[in-house]
């Protein structure tokens, strides 16, 4: 049985992009015979300035939304990264086979470091080594497949390189994973800046649809979405990013392809209206389940506790084997 691992970082409220590009896909894979682990990667949220209380609150909210989206703890493992010490243990070993040059070539590091410096802040070492911890997250479980968006593909490629390098130097220890991506909506873009990702870490704004937005707020954001200078509804990511983003969102909500849907609309207004309603209907059952789960906090805590216990049982033997392989004495 193949093993799947993926995670979500609690740096902001989960967005439509997180759902279409990640969480909904998790619900699909965990029902089809895969051994799937889904994680709130809270350690990754500490790489920038943060409010501790907010990280805890967003971690709990992310876990609740994952369950509300349809993840079944009877069929998959849902847990919090910091509850499983093996992630941090293995991360140091991965640092011992990674190079400084590899870390500095990571696109996300360069972009985030540049933004931090523009704000006059200092860049934390943990931001540079973020991909190493991500590699440890993946490799600790013998992961075969990692469902990711386009922006994380480079990190999975690094994970593959580190696994191969470790295996060559110290003996076969790790499964070499591969990234999997959805055909549609792998990267939902900001409705006001359609060349930028709809990121949960961004400031609150009209271009971001959050999973817990009220229906009227969703409609308002979609109807005010930036389109393009042309008048025809044409799917072309390069020259028509605004309308293409709406078509991809609609296709992800209702099925079909963006190209086929483009031929069904004669105006931007009609496309926006249908897209807005499709998003509202997509989020409605998730929001209802989220409300019900919030009324049972003990249930969510129990799921996370049981998930962490199983995750430790899976990760510990492989991490212990890596410690032996690299030359460390057994305790």
From Swiss-Prot:
<feature type="binding site">
    <location>
        <begin position="149"/>
        <end position="151"/>
    </location>
    <ligand>
        <name>ATP</name>
    </ligand>
</feature>
<dbReference type="GO" id="GO:0005524">
    <property type="term" value="F:ATP binding"/>
</dbReference>
<keyword id="KW-0547">Nucleotide-binding</keyword>
<keyword id="KW-0648">Protein biosynthesis</keyword>
<dbReference type="GO" id="GO:0004830">
    <property type="term" value="F:tryptophan-tRNA ligase activity"/>
</dbReference>
<feature type="binding site">
    <location>
        <position position="137"/>
    </location>
    <ligand>
        <name>L-tryptophan</name>
    </ligand>
</feature>
<dbReference type="InterPro" id="IPR050203">
    <property type="entry name" value="Trp-tRNA_synthetase"/>
</dbReference>
<comment type="subunit">
    <text>Homodimer.</text>
</comment>
<dbReference type="InterPro" id="IPR014729">
    <property type="entry name" value="Rossmann-like_a/b/a_fold"/>
</dbReference>
<dbReference type="InterPro" id="IPR002305">
    <property type="entry name" value="aa-tRNA-synth_Ic"/>
</dbReference>
<feature type="binding site">
    <location>
        <begin position="197"/>
        <end position="201"/>
    </location>
    <ligand>
        <name>ATP</name>
    </ligand>
</feature>
<keyword id="KW-0030">Aminoacyl-tRNA synthetase</keyword>
<dbReference type="InterPro" id="IPR002306">
    <property type="entry name" value="Trp-tRNA-ligase"/>
</dbReference>
<feature type="short sequence motif" description="'KMSKS' region">
    <location>
        <begin position="197"/>
        <end position="201"/>
    </location>
</feature>
<dbReference type="GO" id="GO:0005829">
    <property type="term" value="C:cytosol"/>
</dbReference>
<dbReference type="Pfam" id="PF00579">
    <property type="entry name" value="tRNA-synt_1b"/>
</dbReference>
<feature type="binding site">
    <location>
        <begin position="9"/>
        <end position="11"/>
    </location>
    <ligand>
        <name>ATP</name>
    </ligand>
</feature>
<feature type="binding site">
    <location>
        <position position="188"/>
    </location>
    <ligand>
        <name>ATP</name>
    </ligand>
</feature>
<comment type="similarity">
    <text>Belongs to the class-I aminoacyl-tRNA synthetase family.</text>
</comment>
<comment type="function">
    <text>Catalyzes the attachment of tryptophan to tRNA(Trp).</text>
</comment>
<feature type="short sequence motif" description="'HIGH' region">
    <location>
        <begin position="10"/>
        <end position="18"/>
    </location>
</feature>
<keyword id="KW-0963">Cytoplasm</keyword>
<dbReference type="GO" id="GO:0006436">
    <property type="term" value="P:tryptophanyl-tRNA aminoacylation"/>
</dbReference>
<keyword id="KW-0067">ATP-binding</keyword>
<dbReference type="InterPro" id="IPR024109">
    <property type="entry name" value="Trp-tRNA-ligase_bac-type"/>
</dbReference>
<feature type="binding site">
    <location>
        <begin position="17"/>
        <end position="18"/>
    </location>
    <ligand>
        <name>ATP</name>
    </ligand>
</feature>
<protein>
    <recommendedName>
        <fullName>Tryptophan--tRNA ligase 1</fullName>
        <ecNumber>6.1.1.2</ecNumber>
    </recommendedName>
</protein>
<keyword id="KW-0436">Ligase</keyword>
<dbReference type="InterPro" id="IPR001412">
    <property type="entry name" value="aa-tRNA-synth_I_CS"/>
</dbReference>
